Amino acid sequence: MPLVFGAIGQRTDTALDTSFSLDSVMTLLSQRYVVREGDFRKGAPAISLDNLSLRAIAANVGWYATEGKPAGSLPIDWGDFYERGGHERTYFPWNVSNLSAADVLEKIANVEGGPDITFRPYMADAHHVRLRMVAGSDADPYVGQDVVRRLQWFHGAGSVHSLTVAHLGPVERVYATGAGTEEEKDVALAEDLTYCRQSDPWPIVEECVSCTDSDDHALLEGHARGRLVADWWPLCQVTCTVDLADPQVPRIGEVWPGDAMTLAVEGFPTIPDGEYPVRLMEMSGDLGTLVTLKFDPMRDPAET
């Protein structure tokens, strides 16, 4: 089973050897733009995607950035281009500087209710590896899975080692700016000041997001609300190390970034004992058996 996929990036040669990096699929897509092939000119029509699910819009964005260009094909299965839904997106060629496919996909994922989007390698046949775009639906933005794996931490034992917890206070207000210039620039505000107005208040924290590629005010409001929903709670982020030599630990390839897991904690100073639903954000390691797992930020259980 393939676990890591990349394209050969910058290569450096010496008289004795060569070295190169692997570029991820998002790095490749950051160098492709969502523009209709053969029709880039002043006044050219926009790419309009209407009445589709967000993951179908993402699939179409991927097609325009790959199959829709000469020598643009990449070994990616984009999925259903026609899945119906209540979403629309318009991409104007004059806004090309904001239309790298990677940026567009990130904005689709980060809008309020946006789906998780990931790329997973698989063996297309005995000799070829392809990628499959896996994305959540409009009804359930998370990537589907068959089994929820369990990890546990407690003093002296458990399948988790080196547990660390980073804490972050809430963001109560988000300013968003959209298309336009100077006084004509579109703006939107999302706020919830509940934490500022309680008896022992949190100090107000504000964020600003820019979405200059959209002149749709409702979409701009969705970006602002999406950021507020993500950051409003007092948050914590758990990072831990697991040893693949431990039979209690799931194997690489059994879990992927984006998967839900259960983390059982007992005796940690700043997290109450209990079982916590967590979502795997990142996995890292080397050729050894130790793997570092970083989970998505979650609502801080010590602040509830």
What residue ranges belong to the model's regions?
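Generic solvent-exposed, charged/amphipathic alpha-helical segments
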Residues: 58-63, 105-110, 262
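Acidic, small/polar-enriched beta strand-loop surface segments
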Residues: 137-283, 303-304
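Surface-exposed cap/loop segments at beta↔alpha junctions
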Residues: 1-82
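Short intrinsically disordered coil segments
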Residues: 35-42, 151-153, 294-298
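Short beta-strand-centered interaction patches in the first periplasmic/extracellular domains
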Residues: 10-29, 78-170
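Extended non-globular C-terminal regions
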Residues: 130-134, 253-256, 288-296, 304
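Short beta-strand and beta-hairpin "edge-sheet" elements
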Residues: 1-23, 27, 262-297
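Ordered hydrophobic segments in well-structured contexts
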Residues: 1-7, 118, 173-175
